Every structure is written in structure tokens, then in C-alpha cells.
Amino acid sequence: MKFIEVKNLKIEFTKIDESGREVPGKTALDGISLDIEKGSFVAVVGMNGSGKSTLAKCFNGLLAPSAGRVIVGGFDTAEEAHIWDVRCRVGMVFQNPYNQIVSSIVEDDVAFGPENLGIEPKEIRRRVDDALKRVGMYELRDKGAHMLSGGQKQRIAIAGAIAMRPECIVFDEPTAMLDPKGRASVMSIIRDLNAEGITCILITHFMSEAEQADRVIVLKNGKVLCDRTPEELFSDKEMIERAGLEMPPAIEIRDKAGLPEHLTTADDIADYIAKQ
């Protein structure tokens, strides 16, 4: 079942010329068409400037199309009357965890979104407790947000998105500023959320994260270069080179060891070796 439909999407930014007039500037997305299935886990990758984060902002209406359409759960993101419907269905978690905290106390920060929906206090309490437990931060619910590490702050940002009860969460490079331990924690949470039926869209430049998705969309110069399963993509070295990407470490180990191509993650490889 289609949850997000992107039809010939174009995003153009304008600039001011020397005479002070607004003129066409960069075309960030150029004719993007794709569908996101409900309950899927999709990774979007590409070099810097490929259009990844711009596309992410289109999924919940932060950016309106210059041309084309983005339909979310049946609602057109270009129609202002439907923006609230879109944003209730699609939550977002951004790259910088330090810029996403709006309250001084952990549980107050997670409650911020539901409070703005006008939800009853008892229901907010249930949602906040549930969200914090799901990201492993319940024990720190009454702590000062300023005392948290970057990884902990990112988990709080994810809890805030969960508390809104969206059908989909877009993660825009959520691990870019985290250490390996923080990255692993966030990826574990994303996999768990997807296992519960939440549609997850991961924007990332880490191929080791993309390989954990059901599907990988590769962008280059604002266009879709390819749309494949991780197994298909990481078995095509020529495509990886065209996209300006690097093979995940697990794939490099697999190839050097002469292991079967269907093994795409470190866990796959470990399980295969253990059974030999």
C-alpha cells in the first residue's frame, strides 16, 4: 500500500541578482518520481548536494514543490489546508541533536508536541512514558536536557517524534554527529520502530546504515540514479562508483573472503560463518 507518492517533483530555489531582482537559482530536485510503501524501511543516499535533505523536507511539507506533487496518506503537501494532516502523519528527526531540544527537562521536551495537539494530560503522560521507554530514556525523564550526551539528545528527539504517534518518521542524517556507540543505538531504535509497523525513511551518508534498509534510493544531482534493494545495489560496484559512494565495510569483507553475494550486513556474515 502506497503511503507517500512523489510525482515528477521539482524543487527550485531563487536568488537575488545584482539589481535586487529575484531570479531562478539552483534546481535541487529535478523530476523525482517514487513511491514509499506503508510500513517499509527506505534509505536515501547520495553525495553531498545530491538532494537528500531537500527530499526529506518534502515528505512532510516543510518544502512545497516548485512543480510536481507529493501525496502523503492521500493529502497533497502543496495544499495549505492539508499541511497539518501531513505533519501529523509524518514526523521528522534532524541531524543536529542540540538544535531539537525545546525544553529544559527531558519529559517536558517529549510532551511538547502532544501538548500542541491539545491532547488530554493523562494521554500525554501515557505517550511520554511510552516513548521514553521505547528509546531507553525513561530513567532520565526528570533530568535536565542540557546534561545529556549527543546520542541521548538524539534519542529524546526520536521520543518526541514517537509521542506524536505518526505513521512515518523521516530521519535526516540522525547519526551524522554521533560516535559509533550513539550511531548503533539510534539505528537499533529505527529498526525496532519499523518492526512495529512505522514507515521509516533514513537519509544517510553511511552505507553501513543504508544496507540495513529494505530498499535504497540513490540520488545524484537532484535525480534518482537508482532504486534497488541493498543486495542489488551493493553487488553493483559500477553503480556505487557512479554515485560517488563507498562500499559498506561488511561488503568489502564479504568480497575479500569470497562469501556469497546475498550476505549484505555484518550480522548476515556472522550468522553465515557461524553455521559453516
Language-model-derived ranges and their functions:
Residues 68-78, 86:
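Conserved ABC transporter NBD signature motif
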Residues 122-140:
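Conserved ABC ATPase "signature" region
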Residues 169-172:
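Catalytic Walker B motif of ABC-type/P-loop ATPase nucleotide-binding domains
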